[in-house]
Amino acid sequence: MDHAGTMRRAYDLLNDGDVDGFGDLLADDFVEHEELPGLAPGKEGVKAFFRMYHAAFPDLRMEAQDVLPSGDKVVARARATGTHRGEFMGIPATGKRIDVQLVDIIRFGDDGLAREHWGVFDSMAMMQQLGVVPEGPPV
């Protein structure tokens, strides 16, 4: 499977709630460059992060909108949707839907496993959609 296919497979596994299967796509020395407060670094922290998201948003879906390979890296623009059904970062369940944009950049090793991740997630939009942060005026 090429790197773009592996990226799509990662989203599919997460959509199925298969965090362990997702973890199998990550190298043991995986480096996460996105801060995950309160979680272990690396592969185990990333798996804990997605378990936390699935507990709070059981219908979490990540839809790849663009997947762009370049050498040993893949950039994906994606959309995350779900319904807030469980506690999330101290926020009690609201029953509200989220629909946010994200960008993932993954560097793969010669063995086809993900070695590094950089990501951008529109957490402000998510907090506004959950009603935690008021929506501002249009820009």
Predicted regions and their residues:
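C-terminal and inter-domain tail/linker signature
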Residues: 1-139
